[in-house]
């Protein structure tokens, strides 16, 4: 079974309400389904690391990719609930960030759960009841401190969340990313990009991270 892939993001694909990426690893192209939210954050022709859940059927196999091991494991917990298949699991993770989903399940927030495509009241109730105890293992998925906490308002990148998600998909951890954004905001690479310049922030962070690892 495939559990992890690292390769080059060749292209994104969409089939109906499903979206994903063609990931080239050692000369082989893998079609991996992602949440739409994750797919929109990918940069063309970039290196990409994904934690994989593989579903094997008689007519073939399907790969589902996630930017972190915790999110992949949360997906596996979701689809272990009766009536929640892989598409519903992806819909939940598209609608809610992992820490928001954990909070909704542990708090029995049925209205929030029902906002995900394909999740009705009965399924939401089943999620809240069946996962009340096991979801506690994901308590570490609490909202992280802001990447820009403590920065002057004119330095705060409005594109910070998108930059963070892209860097995580490239294999950087959250601590490295926070350090990079703070360093760029403090002028480590000259005048910081404007708050809405996602490409500028991403480019500056990648350059800073590359220098730090050299």
Swiss-Prot record:
Pfam families: HHH_5 (PF14520), RuvA_C (PF07499), RuvA_N (PF01330). Residues 147-157 are annotated as: Flexible linker. One of its GO terms (cellular component) is Holliday junction resolvase complex. Has three domains with a flexible linker between the domains II and III and assumes an 'L' shape. Domain III is highly mobile and contacts RuvB. Residues 68-146 are annotated as: Domain II. It comes from Synechococcus sp. (strain CC9902). Belongs to the RuvA family. Its main location: cytoplasm. The keyword DNA-binding applies. The RuvA-RuvB-RuvC complex processes Holliday junction (HJ) DNA during genetic recombination and DNA repair, while the RuvA-RuvB complex plays an important role in the rescue of blocked DNA replication forks via replication fork reversal (RFR). RuvA specifically binds to HJ cruciform DNA, conferring on it an open structure. The RuvB hexamer acts as an ATP-dependent pump, pulling dsDNA into and through the RuvAB complex. HJ branch migration allows RuvC to scan DNA until it finds its consensus sequence, where it cleaves and resolves the cruciform DNA. Residues 157-214 are annotated as: Domain III. One of its GO terms (biological process) is DNA repair. Residues 1-67 are annotated as: Domain I. It is found in: Cytoplasm. Homotetramer. Forms an RuvA(8)-RuvB(12)-Holliday junction (HJ) complex. HJ DNA is sandwiched between 2 RuvA tetramers; dsDNA enters through RuvA and exits via RuvB. An RuvB hexamer assembles on each DNA strand where it exits the tetramer. Each RuvB hexamer is contacted by two RuvA subunits (via domain III) on 2 adjacent RuvB subunits; this complex drives branch migration. In the full resolvosome a probable DNA-RuvA(4)-RuvB(12)-RuvC(2) complex forms which resolves the HJ. This is Holliday junction branch migration complex subunit RuvA. Keywords: Cytoplasm, DNA damage, DNA recombination, DNA repair, DNA-binding. GO terms for molecular function: ATP binding; four-way junction DNA binding; four-way junction helicase activity.
């Amino acid at each position: 079974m495939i559990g992890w892939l690292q390769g080059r993001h060749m292209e994104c694909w969409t089939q109906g309400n499903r979206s994903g990426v063609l990931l080239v690893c050692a000369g082989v192209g893998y079609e991996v389904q992602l949440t739409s939210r994750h797919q929109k954050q990918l940069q063309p022709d970039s290196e990409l690391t994904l934690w994989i859940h593989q579903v094997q059927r008689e007519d073939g196999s399907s790969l589902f990719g996630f930017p972190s091991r915790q999110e992949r494991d949360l997906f596996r917990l979701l689809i272990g609930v009766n009536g929640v298949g892989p598409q519903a699991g992806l819909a939940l993770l598209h609608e809610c960030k992992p820490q928001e989903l954990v909070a909704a399940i542990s708090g029995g927030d049925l209205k929030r759960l029902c906002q995900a495509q394909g999740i009705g009241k009965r399924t939401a109730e089943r999620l809240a009841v069946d996962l009340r105890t096991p979801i506690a293992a994901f308590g570490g998925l609490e909202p992280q401190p802001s990447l820009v906490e403590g920065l002057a308002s004119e330095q705060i990148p409005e594109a910070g969340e998108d930059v963070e998600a892209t860097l995580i998909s490239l294999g950087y951890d959250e601590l490295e990313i926070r350090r990079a954004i703070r360093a760029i905001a403090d002028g480590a690479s000259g005048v910081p990009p404007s708050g809405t310049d996602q490409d500028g922030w991403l480019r500056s962070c990648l350059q800073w991270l590359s220098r730090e690892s050299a």
